Structures are given as structure tokens and as C-alpha cells.
């Protein structure tokens, strides 16, 4: 976990102008008091690494001071643009959550761009919102805490639970999700669970992992019309909202080659912090469903954080 030194804290009364270095800033739930960018939005605090500034200086042949790129906090020791939305910066009681990497350049409306024809903030600056406020001074350090995504995979199969055969679908989902997280650079923890086809056990386990704020919950099995298929009707009462489009599109896409896909009652939705997907039980089906769901996972994660569309 890298330690990030704070070289300067900076404020301005107007947007689109350089910020001036000050001895201390006061972070509140709305951002930095007395700074033009404070407010109830996701870009309350801007940060830029001195390493990015120095690289830009070498490219344009000019020197820049703290706050010249309108950053609130100038740092050293970590290339901030390697962070991702959901990562956190902590200094004592102060905690910031990264919400955006880079931004659209203001072009000629930006003082730096006007002078140099380019700017570093749109590509290498980051933005954050305040989760816990306090007073922050130059010389302090941030601990960088990457967002660790929690995945819980629940296989429903009485026969697999009794050892009649091995669970292959749950591990296949775990493999696909692990590959997805590796591609995105997401730290993750993937936990597999195996339970019989019982309403009580599924309800209890779902309630537990939702309470633990699991980010993504995948179930496999129990989505058909057989006498032991109980997954959708057990999951649905726990949802605050459904997300019907994903499963509808999967059924539409794969039913052209296999009409039996239309018999799946798979659903998706949100319960508290958790996004839940109920998948069929076959290995082939979980490959198809998980592959399609992964297309939307990053967007869903950021929307759930309140980071827009």
C-alpha cells in the first residue's frame, strides 16, 4: 500500500484559474471550504502528482508551481492516474474516494492551455469526493487503499452438495470473473459457496453476503421450471430494484441457436450495496451469461457508486 506525500494544498475562488498554495485546507462533506469547486458533486477535490507535472515541464520546456494546473492537492510518490474510481486516500481521520481519472480539457478557456497549447490535468489528474473531512496540511501523507471487489458465487445443487458430482459451474464463474478483474486491474476476492436447493439456506446465505456488502453476487442453478428450481422467487423479494434488460438480452441472443434458453427465469437486480445475478446451472450457460454480464460490470459498479452514466 503506497504512501503518498502531500507537497501542497491549494485553493481558488474561481473555476478555470490556477489555485494558490495555502497552509491548510478544511475538508467537509461538500469538499474544500472556500474553494470554487466545492459542492454536492463527484469532483469536489482535484489531485495531481508532481511526477506528472515534471514530465509535462520536460515536454513543454516551462516550469510550473503548485496549483498552476488548478489542482487542490499536489502529491509525490505515486502516479495518481494509476488509481481507479472507488480507490481511497486516507490521512488520519480524513478519507477521500477517487471518482474520476482525468477530465475534458477546457481548451482555450484554461489558462495553462492558453499559455502552452496543452495541459496535464485532463490525462493525469484525478478527482475525489470527501467521505470523512478534517484539516489537511502540506507535509502530511495519504495511505492509498485500492478498492477490493468482493464477489460471492453461490451454487445451488443438492446432488453436488451431497457429493454425487463435482460443482463445475461455480468454479467456471470464478475463473471468468478472475480473468475479468485481472484485465481491469481490479483487486478482488472471489468466494464460492455450495448449498442444496433449499429456500431457507439460500435466503440465509444471501442475507449474510448482502450484509457484508458483497459487490457482486452470482448464483448458478435453480432458474428453470423443475420442482426444485427456487432461485428467482427466493432472490426477488430481497431486491430493491430489478435490472431486467441484461437477462432479457442474453435470452434473446442465445435463444436463436438454442430455443430452450427462453425457459430460463434468470433475473438480475440490486440489494443494498450488492448487484445480484441468477444464472442457470450448466457450465455452457454460465459461460454465456457471465461473458455477457462482464460487459456491463464496470459500468454497473461505477453507477452504483453514484458516478453517473
Mark where each language-model region is:
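Short, basic/aromatic beta-hairpin or loop at an interaction surface
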Residues: 62-72, 110-125
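Electropositive, beta-rich accessory/interaction domains or terminal extensions
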Residues: 1-103
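Proline/glycine-rich low-complexity loops and linkers
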Residues: 231-309
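Short alpha-helix capping/helix-loop boundary micro-motifs
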Residues: 74-77, 81-82, 125-134
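N-terminal small/polar loop signature for handling phosphorylated ligands or for N-terminal nucleophile
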Residues: 178-180, 185-220, 224-239
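Mid-chain, well-packed structural core segment of small domains
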Residues: 77-109, 241-262, 266
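Loop/turn positions that initiate beta-strands
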Residues: 86, 93, 133-141
Amino acid at each position: 500500500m503506497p504512501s503518498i506525500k502531500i507537497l501542497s494544498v491549494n485553493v481558488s475562488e474561481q473555476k478555470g484559474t490556477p489555485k494558490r498554495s495555502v497552509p491548510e485546507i478544511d475538508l467537509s462533506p461538500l469538499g474544500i471550504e472556500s474553494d470554487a469547486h466545492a459542492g454536492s458533486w463527484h469532483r469536489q477535490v482535484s489531485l495531481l502528482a508532481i511526477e506528472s507535472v515534471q514530465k509535462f515541464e520536460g515536454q513543454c520546456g516551462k516550469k510550473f508551481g503548485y496549483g498552476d494546473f488548478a489542482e487542490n492537492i499536489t502529491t509525490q510518490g505515486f502516479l495518481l492516474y494509476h488509481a481507479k474510481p472507488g480507490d481511497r486516500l486516507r490521512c488520519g481521520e480524513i478519507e477521500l474516494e477517487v471518482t474520476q481519472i482525468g477530465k475534458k480539457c477546457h481548451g482555450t478557456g484554461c489558462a495553462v492551455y492558453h499559455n502552452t497549447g496543452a495541459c496535464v490535468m485532463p490525462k493525469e489528474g484525478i478527482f475525489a469526493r470527501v467521505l470523512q473531512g478534517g484539516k489537511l496540511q502540506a507535509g502530511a501523507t495519504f495511505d492509498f487503499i485500492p478498492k477490493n471487489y468482493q464477489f460471492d458465487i453461490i451454487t445451488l445443487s443438492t446432488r453436488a452438495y451431497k457429493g454425487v458430482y463435482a460443482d463445475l459451474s461455480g468454479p467456471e464463474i470464478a475463473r471468468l470473473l478472475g480473468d475479468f478483474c485481472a484485465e481491469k486491474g481490479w483487486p478482488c476476492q472471489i468466494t464460492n459457496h455450495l448449498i442444496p436447493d433449499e429456500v431457507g439456506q439460500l435466503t440465509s446465505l444471501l442475507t449474510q453476503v448482502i450484509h457484508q456488502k458483497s459487490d457482486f453476487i452470482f448464483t448458478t442453478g435453480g432458474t428453470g421450471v423443475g420442482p426444485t428450481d427456487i432461485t428467482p422467487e427466493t432472490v426477488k423479494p430481497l431486491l430493491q430494484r430489478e435490472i431486467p434488460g441484461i437477462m432479457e438480452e442474453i435470452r434473446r441472443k442465445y435463444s436463436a441457436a438454442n430455443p430452450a434458453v427462453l425457459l430460463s427465469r434468470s433475473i438480475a437486480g440490486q440489494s443494498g450495496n450488492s448487484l445480484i445475478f441468477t444464472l442457470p446451472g450448466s457450465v455452457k450457460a454460465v459461460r454465456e451469461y457471465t461473458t455477457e454480464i462482464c460487459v456491463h460490470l464496470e459500468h454497473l459498479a461505477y453507477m452504483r457508486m453514484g458516478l453517473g452514466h
